[in-house]
Amino acid sequence: MTAANQETILELRDVKKYFPIRSGLFQRKVGDVKAVDGVSFSLKKGETLGIVGESGCGKSTAGRTMIRLYKPTEGQILFKGQDISNLSEEKLRKSVRKNIQMVFQDPFASLNPRKTLRSIIKEPFNTHNMYTMRERNEKVEELLARVGLHPSFAGRYPHEFSGGQRQRIGIARALTLNPELIIADEPVSALDVSIQAQVINLMEELQEEFNLTYLFISHDLSVVRHISDRVGVMYLGKMMELTGKHELYDNPLHPYTQALLSSVPVTRKRGSVKRERIVLKGELPSPANPPKGCVFHTRCPVAKPICKEQIPEFKEAAPSHFVACHLYS
């Protein structure tokens, strides 16, 4: 779904999320894990923005910070123009929670094993005091049917279902309050490839039907390419590159993005140019002690002296194509 000329539903302005490192008998603070370190972008109503990167890059923490499961250390999070960065839990529940929901990576761990599907899915109705008991039960059955599960399953427990079915249950729960934005954190990474396709297709159908906006977090570049309108690439808590999916996959600018895309297996037409495989040296540095300057310079194959000293500005290097790299300064 295109996001051209549409309103901004979510905006991050230099958002940081640090976790304190404590040590010693009195648990004094000795440092910070910089999980998210100065991320800025906006999300348009009706679009799907994919966020990709290696494990430990901060993408899941960024998603949980956006929905205020974590309170940001610094920066602003604006939902439909309202700054929700410092709202109390009560105000979040009244003005934000209904409109932003999350689908988690592990479809089993995110469901209470002691509760039936009916209890799990209608819990948001209970929390927000919506509908009569009869209407709540009817809504549960409607939601189960909409995600491809038989309404008679409402009395069963999560352990009775497969991984793909459990993820459908998680999606049904996320839809209960008619949200405008759904943050999907690796929603298909724990599923078989054939089941992944079914869940992705379901999410696309639901987006069209309910006019949803998605923030889709994944390490799988192929899945992100299929579902996203724009794609952002994160590395060590920072946004490296952000642009439309076709532009990113056809013309990646940042050396890290180029390395990621070179690792994706592709089928080529006869006569097409083969993309050179770029192998990054070394391990991902610790977010507790990120490199000075550009955080990627320790693994970058084209690093310059300035990369070791100065943090590159995240700026527009081409129309609607943002990148944080000194090569485009």
From Swiss-Prot:
Residues where ATP binds: 53-60
Among SMART domains, the record links this protein to:
AAA
What membrane topology is annotated for this entry?
A: Peripheral membrane protein
Q: Which residues form the ABC transporter domain?
A: 10-261
Its subcellular locations are:
Cell membrane
Chief location category = membrane
Q: Which domain of life is it from?
A: Bacteria
Chain's role = This protein is a component of an oligopeptide permease, a binding protein-dependent transport system. This APP system can completely substitute for the OPP system in both sporulation and genetic competence, though, unlike OPP, is incapable of transporting tripeptides. Probably responsible for energy coupling to the transport system.
Record-stated family: Belongs to the ABC transporter superfamily.
Q: What is this protein called?
A: Oligopeptide transport ATP-binding protein AppF
Organism classification:
Bacteria, Bacillati, Bacillota, Bacilli, Bacillales
Q: Which gene encodes it?
A: appF
